[in-house]
């Protein structure tokens, strides 16, 4: 993880600014790092995500997915942060979102998500049920577009521990 962080964000510190990271807080570089770091946290907390979805007892295969990139501008490639393919014939397509403030899903973002879903179905040729899941670092503004998601999971769910029931 540190090596990835270094080559992506610190290698360009040409002036050897010892406060490089502090000086870059609030910049696009900083928020890009926050988004990638939040994705990595989510990918290491699959069991907690399954718990939040209520699918603890279901065998699942979890992975990230990227479509075949097209050179056709009308048929853009897509990427899904986390796919949870379940043994109960459901596939959860998880969008992992880091924002500093409350996240609002607008029509443009909704179109992007729907395109990802369509591309995934086309390329996998699946007849399984597809659920859209949003995993958000912060709160989400509830509106007509947020209702497209089967479930919204917040970052605090990633750090809950299961209690053993006897």
Q: Where is each model-derived feature located?
A:
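Accessory nucleic acid-recognition modules appended to NTPase machines
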Residues: 1-80
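Extended hydrophobic-aromatic, low-complexity segments
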Residues: 12-16, 54-58, 73-76, 90-95, ...
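Acidic, metal/cofactor-coordinating or nucleic-acid-engaging core segments within structured domains
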Residues: 44, 54, 115-124
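Conserved catalytic cores of phosphodiester-cleaving nucleases, focusing on short active-site segments
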Residues: 46, 80-100, 113-114, 132
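Mg2+/Mn2+-dependent nuclease catalytic core
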Residues: 99-119
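Domain-level recognition of nuclease-like catalytic cores that cleave nucleotide substrates
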Residues: 126-166
């Amino acid at each position: 993880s540190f090596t990835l962080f270094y080559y992506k964000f610190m290698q360009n510190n040409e002036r050897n600014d010892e406060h490089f990271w502090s000086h870059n807080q609030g910049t696009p570089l900083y928020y890009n790092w926050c988004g990638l770091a939040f994705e990595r946290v989510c990918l290491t907390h699959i069991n907690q995500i399954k718990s939040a979805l209520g699918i603890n007892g279901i065998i699942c295969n979890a992975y990230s997915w990227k479509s075949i990139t097209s050179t056709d501008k009308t048929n853009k490639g897509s990427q899904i942060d986390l796919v949870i393919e379940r043994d109960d014939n459901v596939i959860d397509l998880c969008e992992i979102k880091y924002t500093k403030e409350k996240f609002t899903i607008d029509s443009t973002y909704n179109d992007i998500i729907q395109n990802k879903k369509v591309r995934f179905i086309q390329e996998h040729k699946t007849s399984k049920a597809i659920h859209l899941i949003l995993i958000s670092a912060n709160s989400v503004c509830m509106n007509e577009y947020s209702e497209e998601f089967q479930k919204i999971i917040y970052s605090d769910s990633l750090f809950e521990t299961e209690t053993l029931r006897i």
